[in-house]
Amino acid sequence: MTETPQRTRPLRVLAAMSGGVDSAVAAARAAEAGHDVTGVHLALSANPQSFRTGARGCCTIEDSRDARRAADVIGIPFYVWDLADRFREDVVEDFVAEYEAGRTPNPCLRCNEKIKFAALLDKALALGFDAVCTGHYAQVILREDGVRELHRASDMAKDQSYVLGVLDDRQLAHAMFPLGDTVTTKDEIRAEAERRGLAVAKKPDSHDICFIADGNTQGFLADRLGKAEGDIVDEAGNRLGTHEGAYGYTIGQRKGLRIGTPAPDGKPRYVLDISPVNNTVTVGPAEALDVDALRAIKPRWCGAAPTGPGTYTAQLRAHGGETEVRAELVDGTLEVTFSEPVRGVAPGQAIVLYDGTRVVGSATIASTTRATAGAA
């Protein structure tokens, strides 16, 4: 477990336990390291589907029971905290509003920013806890001058620093990631859970948006925003088909387009632009998705903000690769230029900047510039 100044003595640690294997092993490691650990499961959903057997996500009653059983095996106190109202306001309503505006949000990143390391952390500190522990794969590393840095996990294949890139210095000072500094496969984590007697050792990972129980994002949005039929057009404005709500699409999407005829060249079409004002979805060839620059707003820095232009690597989606960029903060907006064109960048997603393995900061993508023409 990576050390910080506060980690040199036993801490009172609140372990966020989702009911999955990663958070259970993280809590067990924190307890084994000598910390005074208390487990907590966050009740985040008022959706009745979350209470049915087999519901997917990480907010179900079964997950709460799994977390409690794991805490019992570890030998730590356990509580369930109801943060459903805060989660609905800060994550679910934001998710719907962003899609309605033609953007593609990342609810996991938003949850880390507003729930796990804000609502949960604030309550933990008020109750006298020193740190919040989660099962994320990332590292908080202490420099010689006492500054804490957020770094990628030792195992790049499982690194989750992207969804933690919104954390600021205060939040990092109270963050603990016991899984981040070990190079182990998921099978090894499961084997460790089994050795510890944790029943979640064989529990499948959840890859769905936790508050959409059936995994149907378009249906979830339609229930809240209603159907709004509009046109699907090509770049010349020719009508190719219709949709039931522009909010149901994202930049780069290929599947689910209701287009009756193929492109003249026979190649697939992709979503290039979403106009909530006109309720229009524009489609075109894959190469039209290439962008060479973007503007990003609401920057958050893990440490001091850069004082001038710099060269970094950037990650644009949770499971995406790295790309080299030139970035500069101009009047509070992050101006980014790619060394090579990047395909399918969606406004609303986060760009996270890295200096080696260190997270420099993040911002929300507001607009992009096509590699061949004007703004996307």
Curated annotation (Swiss-Prot):
Gene3D superfamilies: Adenine nucleotide alpha hydrolases-like domains, HUPs, Translation factors
Keywords: ATP-binding, Cytoplasm, Disulfide bond, Nucleotide-binding, RNA-binding, Transferase, tRNA processing, tRNA-binding
This protein's GO CC annotations: cytoplasm
GO BP, sorted A to Z: tRNA wobble position uridine thiolation
EC number: 2.8.1.13
Catalytic residues (positions): C111 (nucleophile), C210 (cysteine persulfide intermediate)
Disulfide bridges in this chain: C111-C210
Subcellular location: Cytoplasm
SUPFAM superfamilies named in the record: Adenine nucleotide alpha hydrolases-like
Site for Interaction with tRNA, residues: H136, Q349
Residues that, per the record, bind ATP: A16, M17, S18, G19, G20, V21, D22, S23, L42, G135
Reaction catalysis annotation: S-sulfanyl-L-cysteinyl-[protein] + uridine(34) in tRNA + AH2 + ATP = 2-thiouridine(34) in tRNA + L-cysteinyl-[protein] + A + AMP + diphosphate + H(+)
Annotated spans, Interaction with tRNA: 158-160
Primary residence: cytoplasm
InterPro entries in alphabetical order: MnmA-like (IPR004506), MnmA-like_C (IPR046885), MnmA-like_central (IPR046884), MnmA-like_central_sf (IPR023382), Rossmann-like_a/b/a_fold (IPR014729)
Domain of life: Bacteria
GO molecular function, one term: tRNA binding
HAMAP family assigned: tRNA_thiouridyl_MnmA (MF_00144)
Matches recorded under PANTHER family: MITOCHONDRIAL TRNA-SPECIFIC 2-THIOURIDYLASE 1, TRNA 5-METHYLAMINOMETHYL-2-THIOURIDYLATE -METHYLTRANSFERASE
The family this protein is said to belong to: Belongs to the MnmA/TRMU family.
Protein name: tRNA-specific 2-thiouridylase MnmA
The species this protein was found in: Streptomyces coelicolor (strain ATCC BAA-471 / A3(2) / M145)
Gene: mnmA
